[in-house]
Each structure stands twice: as C-alpha cells, then as structure tokens.
From Swiss-Prot:
Name of this protein: S-adenosylmethionine/S-adenosylhomocysteine transporter
Organism of provenance: Chlamydia trachomatis serovar L2 (strain ATCC VR-902B / DSM 19102 / 434/Bu)
Classification via InterPro entries: AA-Vitamin_Transporters (IPR050638), EamA_dom (IPR000620)
Membrane topology, as annotated: Multi-pass membrane protein
Notes on how activity is controlled: CCCP treatment reduces SAM intracellular uptake by 50%.
Role of this protein: Transports S-adenosylmethionine (SAM) and S-adenosylhomocysteine (SAH). Allows bacteria to acquire SAM from the eukaryotic host cell and to likely remove the toxic by-product SAH.
Domain EamA: 34-157, 189-313
One Pfam family in the UniProt entry: EamA
Gene Ontology CC: plasma membrane
Compartments where found: Cell membrane
Keyword Transport: yes
Length: 327
C-alpha cells in the first residue's frame, strides 16, 4: 500500500515539473532535496543488513525493472537511438555505478549528515562540468561565489564538526575521499544526463534512467559476486534489508532520481545542486530520527557560508538565462 501511494505521489510530481516559472517548481526542488536526504540514513540501515555492493546492485536493478514496467504500461518507446547508446553506457558506469559504489563504501564510516555535507561540494563540480560539457560560461562573479563556498566547505571537512570543538582535527581520510570522488562523478553524470536529454528528445528521461539503473545494477552485482561473500547471498538481516531496499527504491530511485532528471530540462545542474545545499540539514534530521546520530553544531555554520557563496553564482545564473528557462 505504501509503495502504491509513493508511486502515485511520484506521478503527481512529474505532472508539475514542466512549469518552470511558477513557485511549484521551486517547491518541488526543495521537496526533492528533503526526500532525497533520507537516502543517506536509509543506505546506512541497508548496509547494516547486507554487503554494500549487493545493496547497490539490488536497488538499481529493482528500480530499473520497475521503471521499465511503468514505461511499458504507458506504452512509451524504449528504442535506443544509435547516438544515445554510448552516452547511456557512460552515464551508467560513471553517474550510477561508480558514484553509488563509492558512496556506499564511504558511508560505512561516516555519519549521514557528514556524507550529505560532502555532497554539498556538488555545485562547484557541477559548474565545472557544465562549463566543459555544455559550454556554460563561468564569470568572475561565479568564481568569487565558488571560492567563498569552497573555503567554508574545506574548513568543515578538514577540521571536523564534532560536538566538542577541542576534538576537531584533520579528518580527510579514505571515507571522505571516496565521498568526494562520488560527488565529482555524480555531477559529471547529471550534466551528461542533461546533455543527453537535449540531444535525444525521442527518449524520455525516465527511459534513460531505467537503462542506466539496470546496467549499473548488473555491474554492481557482478562486482559484489567477485569481492563479497555470497552464502547464498551477502545478507545478514533479510527483513531489515527488504525494508531498507524498498524505501530506497521508492524514495531515491523512483521519485528523486526521476524528478531530478525532469527538473534538469528546465534548470541547470548547477542551480539544482545549489538548492541541494539544504540536504545536510535534512540528512541530520533523518540521521537523528532513524539512526540516533547527534547533530554537529558546526554544520549549520558551514552550510550558511556555502549558501552565501553560492548566491553570487546564482545571481549570474539568472542573469545569463541558465535558470528558469524552458527547453
């Protein structure tokens, strides 16, 4: 029953996306960020029940199959144009497979709020990817905003955000590096998806996501079979695994991935990444609610400075016409 309601909710969201100049579109962006921020806590719960690569592959394959089923019910075309084959494969490997594998491995030793804050680096990587892939101009005003936000980001990341200021220290370890790599690859993937949506209008964003999820899921399961112990499957708590995977598929893969992809037709990936800077606050809430994690007091300060820095960028985005334009 919950799954049916969530799917109906996702369909309702999709009908509202193509009104880029109304308040509803902005509301959907922040609603999407609120829902998506729960995925960090849900992912940690899933990894308590099963191996990380198996979790990644299972959710991706299941979500892709569900999306294909929805497309078949709507009788949408699933034929891949020849020019779209290699970009979709590239999107699958970089934007879905590598991003999710690195994220899940890094999450094993990071709190959900810290991991989500590291993903706050995405506006900067998205701006760079948009410049390289879409030839979107980066002005001096944008660079100033990037610099201000980047300084705030690095101060928090390197010196920590623990409750006791005296405990702050160098905290750039392997988990943080994995999450940073996942952030960069994610930004590249979203920019590639936006570029692909422009070039292949005959193929819906949902269909592109479905293909990418299935391919990435199969790669993750193969990776899991090679590196993780299957006896018969790498699941320790089947009930918790099914609950966490079900929630991840519905909220992250079916609702958030597809809504974000739809929004990319009307907003730049840089602007959407900027709006997602509120996600660490939401993730802290879900981490407290679902996992009993404490709220790091330095997080609010760091996010505030990142938002101030990024405001400079988005004044330029509006002026240049990259935001709130129909495509």
């Amino acid at each position: 029953m919950v799954a049916v309601k969530a799917l109906l909710f996702a369909c309702t969201l999709r009908t509202c996306v193509f009104k880029p100049c109304c308040d509803m579109a902005i509301f959907l962006i922040f609603l999407n960020a609120f829902i998506w921020s729960s995925s960090f806590a849900l992912s940690k719960s899933a990894m308590e029940a099963a191996a990380p690569l198996f979790v990644t592959g299972s959710r991706m394959v299941l979500a892709g199959v569900v999306l294909f089923g929805l497309l078949l019910c709507k009788r949408e075309s699933l034929r891949l144009p020849r020019p779209a084959i290699m970009p979709i494969v590239l999107l699958s490997v970089i934007g879905f497979y590598l991003t999710n594998v690195l994220e899940f491995i890094g999450l094993q030793r990071l709190s959900s709020s810290t991991a989500c804050f590291i993903y706050g680096f995405s506006p900067f990587t998205a701006a760079f990817c948009s410049y390289v892939q879409l030839r979107e101009v980066v002005t001096w005003k944008k660079l100033g905003g990037l610099s201000l936000g980047l300084v705030s980001y690095l101060v928090y990341l390197l010196f920590g955000g623990s409750e006791d200021v005296a405990e702050w220290g160098w905290q750039l370890g392997l988990p943080e590096l994995l999450l940073i790599a996942a952030t960069c690859l994610s930004s590249y993937g979203w920019t590639l998806l936006r570029k692909l949506g422009r070039r292949c209008e005959s193929l819906s964003m949902t269909a592109i996501n479905a293909y990418a999820m299935v391919i990435a899921g199969v790669l993750s399961l193969i990776h899991s079979a090679v590196t993780e112990v299957w006896n018969p499957v790498p699941v320790e708590n089947p009930l918790l695994f099914l609950q966490a995977i079900g929630a991840l598929v519905i909220f992250s893969n079916l609702i958030c991935y597809n809504l974000f992809a739809k929004l990319l037709r009307s907003f730049s990936s840089t602007f959407l990444s900027f709006c997602n800077l509120v996600m660490p606050l939401f993730a802290s809430f879900f981490g407290w609610l679902l996992l009993g994690e404490s709220f790091p007091p330095g997080l609010l300060f760091a996010v505030g400075f990142m938002v101030l820095g990024c405001r400079l960028i988005y004044h330029e985005e509006f002026r240049q016409g990259y935001v709130l334009t129909s495509e």
